[in-house]
Amino acid sequence: MKKIPLLTKIIFHISNIGLILLYLYPGSIIGWLIYGDFQKQAKITSDFSIISSNHVFAFIILSLLGVFSFTNKKITFLFLYLFFISIALELCHILIPKRSFEYSDLFGNFLGVFLIFILLKLYQFFKSR
C-alpha cells in the first residue's frame, strides 16, 4: 500500500521539475513540439475569459498529485509552496528572454491550486461529519 503514495510522490516531483523547466525555458518547448516553432506559444485549450486555461489545468494536475502524495501534516506546506511557486515562476518571466509576465497566467495558476484546495477542504469537512 505504501507503493502508491511513493509512486505519486515521485510523479509529483518529476512533474514539478518538468513544470519549472517549461516555465524557465526562454521560448516554448510545447510550441516547438506541436508547431515546430520555439517562438509560438501552444494554445492547448481555449482560455476562460481572462484566465489561462492551460495554466489552470497544469496547476490542478500538480496540486492533485501533491495532495495524493503527502500526509495531512504536510498539506498546508504543499499549498503554500504551490501558491509561492506559481507567483515566483510567473515573475521570472519578466527576466527571461522571449517570455513575458501575464496576469492571465498568474490567475490561472492561482485558480488551479485554489480549486483543489477548496475541493480538499470540502472533502475533509464532509468526511468528518
Give residue ranges: language-model regions:
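Bulky hydrophobic segments
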Residues: 1-97, 101-104, 110, 114-129
